[in-house]
Structures are given as C-alpha cells and as structure tokens.
Amino acid sequence: NLPAISAANLTSIPAGNLTGTVADARISTLSASKLSGSLPALDGSALTGVGVGTADSINTSGIITATAIVSDFQPRNMIINGAMQINARANGTLTINSSTGQYPCDRWVSRGESSSKQFTIQKTSIASSGRGVRNSLKVTSSQAASVGSNDIYNVRQKIEGFNIQRLNLGEAGCASMALSFTVRSSVAGTHSGAIQNESQNRSYPFTYTLVANTWKDVKIIIPPITSGSFNEGTGVGLRVVFDMGSGNAFRGTANQWNSAQNEGATGAVRILETNGATWEISKVQLEEGTVCTPFEKRMVTQETILCERYYQRYGAQRQMWMTNVNGTDHRKMVYFPTTMRVSPTMNMYDQSVDGSSVSAQGVSPNGYYCRLNGNGRHAAWKHEATAEL
C-alpha cells in the first residue's frame, strides 16, 4: 500500500492526465495568471471589487439604485450668467476705483477702492481654451498697489434668497454646496474667495492654486452651516466673492465657516500687488450637494430671461402716440417682458417729445405707464429698469 500523497508534492503533471471535477470549495486565491482560454459566463452578483473607469460604460436592463442624489432641483446652478454670455448694459472695459459697484456683464459686479489702487474689468471673448470657455470676465491690475488692511477688492455675484431656499442654510438639515469654476491668472500661487450671507457675518473663505497663465477647473465643496441668518426672500441670500487683493482685516481662515466678513483667505495672493497682472474666470456654478457636476449649459434665451429679473434695457427707441386723458396729461402703459424682482428704478433716456417731457409713473415689477405732461401727443424714448440686489 502506498502512503497518503499530498497534492503539494505533485508538480509538472500534464493537464491530459487530470480528469474529473474539482469542487468549488477546493478553489481559493486563484491568481489571474493561472487562467487561460475561454471563461464561462459569470454572474455579476458574485463579483466584488470591480472598478469602472470614467471612460467605461455600463449597460443595464434593470433598476439602478443610486447611493446619492446630487440635486432634485432644476436648474441646478444658482449662479445666473455663469458663462458670462449676457451683457445687456453693453459695458466695455470698466475702471474700478471706488466702492460703488460696476457691472461688466449681467449679474456680476465689481468694487474697489481709490484711483491709486484701481484695476479694470471687462467681458472678453476667447477663441479657444480647450475647456469649453467662450466668454470670461477679465481683471487687469493698473499698478502695483499697496493694499491697506481695510481695503476690499472683489468680483462677486449676489444670489436672491428665493433661490437658496433648497439649502436650509443656518438650520439643522442644511445641505452642502458645490462650487466650481474655470479660471486662470498671470499670477501663480494660492488665490482665494468666499461665500457670505446677506449680513456678511457668516463667511466661508476658500482657496485654489493656479499655475501662471494656465486654465484650471476648480471644484470646492462647502460644508453645511447650522447657525446664522440667511435671507430666503427677495433680498440677498448668498454672495459668491472672488478676492482680488483685500486687506488683512477682511481675510480669514480658509475652509471653515467664520463669524466675520471674509472676502478671501489669509495668506492668499493679491492680484493688485502686481502691475499688469491678469485674472480671468468663467463657467461659475454653485449647486446643492457634495458633487461638482458638469457646468449646466442653458439656452441663451433662458439665460436672458433669468437676467431680466434684475436688469432690463430697452435700447430701441419707443415711438408711441399717447392716449388722450385730458388736454395736458397723456399716458401709455408699458409692460416688461419679464417680471422683475421688485419695482425697479427707472431711467428714461434719449427722449424726443412733442410737448414737455416723459416720466415713468406707477412703476411695478410688471411695468409702468409713460406720462407725457404737456400739450403734445407724441413721444419717443428708451428705458433702463434696474432691480439689482
């Protein structure tokens, strides 16, 4: 009789000398190098640890259960005109040299300090960036400024309170936010910005690092905040701020909510400290959740309507014969194409009247009536309606 033979002592046995089947329980830790030939169909339920790359695709005929929902709100992007397409004011290059905000394009406003520390800003067109960017806002420093501790220099957008209700900011159950944008600068290093509430007593400074003159897609996740007051009506819900070089008094610790007015992060670079330095941005998106999704592309008509809630300019001269109320008082109703946020401030310009002058009366978010106070019955004019935050 032969003694028991251990399979561990058998080597170099030709496959043709092996017959029968091997129980599944006898197979373990089988390396991929030991497999060859055609494999039988595999049940996917038995596979674990199988990764899928971003270039791969999966076909399914069943139901997919997602582990997280990015957002159930449409549109996702709370930023309006994030691709810098709409410029109803038709502003060209603006010189920013005071705290009075100026609009290089719709919904975006910039402020600064004195003329000795000024910079310019403009909406620009880009032939090719390789990142789907066709328009941007471009800041250019006019000198190497000596920034004071209390100076504020920024580019920002104010988001209406109604549009942030989905976030439940300042409450238990507050949602995270995902901020993304495409940016480049001639100044390499760590740049910064901030998210602020209306009262500017809650701020979240953020940072992003750039290589000089190279476009970068930036993604930032902003954690929930369960304290502070956040407007959820027609006022300012949030400010999204990009810092151009504010002073130390308006900078704070990055990547946390601070109970202060922070325009940027402590230690970040300042565009204004370098003469001729440039900074450009486009594709700005702020959405609910912990995932930065691809930039939400809107039809230009949709984007225009969203912008018109805050600013409208009727650049073609209106020609109207007035309805005769009495001998010296003539009125004509004018309706806005889009209901505005609040009753706007009206500017009636390029007037050509038969009689005295025209004025906007009975102004509401829906329109106004044009009044010709005089003996004439014909008037021509253009109007500008402003209901910015």
Language-model segment annotations:
Residues 1-76, 287-295:
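Intrinsic low-complexity, repeat-rich intrinsically disordered segments enriched
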Residues 68-389:
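Extracellular and organelle-lumenal recognition/adhesion modules and their flexible linkers in secreted
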